[in-house]
Amino acid sequence: MAFEENFLSAQVLYQLSWNGKLEHPHIIDVEYASDQGGLRLRDVKERLTRLRGHGINDSFSWSYKRTYSKTFIWNDLSDDDVIHPLCGSGEYVLRASELIDTNERKSCDVHSRHSNKSMQSSPTMLLDNVTSKQDTIIGDVHFGALESGENRRIGDKLNCLVRNSGANLEEVKSLRGVSAVISQSLPTLYADQEIMDVEKSDFCLSSSDTEISPRPKMTVDSIKPVKDVNLVVMTKSSTVHGVHTPPSPSLKSSTELPFSPGGTKRLWEKEIRKSLFRTRNSSNVNSVSTEDFTAVHMELPPNTHSTHEDNSFWRDSRSKSPSPSSLNELKEVQIDKEEVEQSTSQLIRLLWARWTGGSSKGKRIPYNTCEGASTKIPESKHNSPYRTKSPYKEIRSTHVEGSHQETRQSLAVQSKARVSLEIKEILPPEECMHYPSPMTVQNVTEVASPHAQTDGGGDVCTIKTIVSEQASQPYPEPRDLRTDQGILSEKTPGLHIAVLEGLTSDAPSGPAEAEVDTPLPAVARAKTGNTLSKLKTIASSKPLPPGFHKGTNDTKPVQITPRRTPRNSIPLASPPLVRSFSRDAVRGFSSLAAISLCPDKDSVACTPSPEKTIVKKRINYSAREEMPLVPGLTTLDWEKALQEATTDCLPPPNFSDILQECSICRRTFKPDSLQVHMRGCHPPQYARAFSARASPHVVRC
């Protein structure tokens, strides 16, 4: 018992921090002598050594938690220092941090630096080791394949020479007979290696552009230097040439392949793709040689000179080997150009004969002029703009098409200029001003008659051209159509135009604006000589107005009153607006203005409905807030007083000052509720006289 009285026990909470991590806290019971003045670090370490081993004492530095100026700090400890408990709780809290040995860290750094320097200073030694290992493996594989005993002995000797870097060159030269045996014993290696080389190669076009040759890619084995002198000699000598696979030679032709059929299929697919690319991007004249091209170039007309100059880039960038198919195509192109590039007068005669001949091939498209016939007719057939009846085949190219179009456009411009000159010679400009718009030309049907083709053919063409060119209005007015009929009848006496009744309006009443913007009907009749009248329906590209109904003969315009919207109520060219502000509408903060639109009398009449001025009643909040709080005024003031008392943290107001008492029943009410109560409040005698129930304020006996 006396021994136990000399020692005390305390619970210690400790936490280890090692390897950058913090362990969960642990708690232990530590005994210490009572005469030493308190718990010391030595006592804690002895207890931890018994529990967790001897290494924990020298591996950590210890500190305990204490209070310092109202905060907690960690106080470092040595073995003889006393650990003080926390103020208030009386707990012992320790923390152990892992020690860092600077000597070991320096030794590790020196070792790593030395290893890095050695790696950087001797890269050639590593390469030598790698190459020697690979060569020894190759030598073992190749020479191990020899079947006879004598060859096997020679192979072993050669392997030894390869391993030894100081071998003599004379001993290597004495083994010249080995190459034949090695080449015979390893026939499959060459085929496999060639297949790999061709599959790795990049196929490209040669300079002649007629064959595709594989271009071997550079690999690591071909770039790697060989440091061993013996291996260099072995590679260069003809005796040991079978050890290393020779580079695959370039193929003589794209069809002769010395390897598997699978590679042949892939190579043919690439060749087909490249040939298609050449034929797609090159012109028909590109494959002609220079001699044939100069001979043909002298025979071609001068108009085609620009076309061949544009093709010079494509001709020079491709091969110059001629082929019979390209020569035939060149002849066809030359024939086509000779037929296309005829004189302008002959081209106009061909177009005129086709136009008036009655055939469906040369019919003009609706509302086209004589000038536009050369450009509008080919669009329906998707052919060349100068296509004639000759049965030759057209050949197109994607890259040369632009130059052909320029030549054809220049011819079309020349033809237009000549036709316009003939028109100016026939009619003076004064008479051209009275002709209608191109919409009237839609209603004239071309009827094939002998009189029109022989005598009045030129006049009809001239009239149609002038009518289409000299029109000044997009839609002619119906009252001007009779003058157009007179002009047409004067120029062509055999032509009679019968216009339907819906075109003109004989009624004098009604404003002139009702006839504006009414397009012509889509049906007209044309009579020429004694021939029967033909009816032709033309679909106009512009939409019909609301008054016209599709599929009916009723072509009279129906006046529909348009619905007024903010957009259509104001015309496009609106007159200046007149703004009038009403001062009566201004009330307080709101400044409202009534704007009335007053257009001129010439424009469409628009009378907008008068709008009522909006008058807003202004509430003077500032004056209301400044009013004093009078008890018994309103319920709002009573609630406001309660709210202000709550927000200002003031004592609640005296309700006896706010509430009012009824003089009859002596009950208290809010000011506004009291007035309602007084309407139905009666004395007790009155209540007993008219009701079986007495007033609640009267006590029954």
Curated annotation (Swiss-Prot):
It comes from the Eukaryota. Residues 238-262, 300-329, 366-389, 538-575 are annotated as: Disordered. It is found in: Cell membrane. GO terms for cellular component: plasma membrane. GO terms for molecular function: protein homodimerization activity; zinc ion binding. Residues 306-319 have a biased composition (Basic and acidic residues). InterPro entries: SOK (IPR010369), SOK_DIX (IPR048351), Znf_C2HC_C3H (IPR049899). GO terms for biological process: cell division; plant organ morphogenesis; protein polymerization; regulation of cell division; specification of plant organ axis polarity. Zn(2+) binds at C662, C665, H677, C681. Its cofactor is Zn(2+). A zinc finger (C2HC/C3H-type) spans 658-687. The keyword Cell division applies. Gene3D superfamilies: Classic Zinc Finger (3.30.160.60). It is a peripheral membrane protein. Residues 8-101 are annotated as: DIX-like oligomerization domain. The keyword ATP-binding does not apply. Keywords: Cell cycle, Cell division, Cell membrane, Developmental protein, Membrane, Metal-binding, Zinc, Zinc-finger. SOSEKI proteins locally interpret global polarity cues and can influence cell division orientation to coordinate cell polarization relative to body axes. 'Soseki' means cornerstone in Japanese. Belongs to the SOSEKI family. The DIX-like oligomerization domain is required for polymerization, edge localization and biological activity. Homodimer. Forms long polymer filaments with other SOKs proteins polymers crucial for polar localization and biological activity. This is Protein SOSEKI 1. The gene is SOK1.
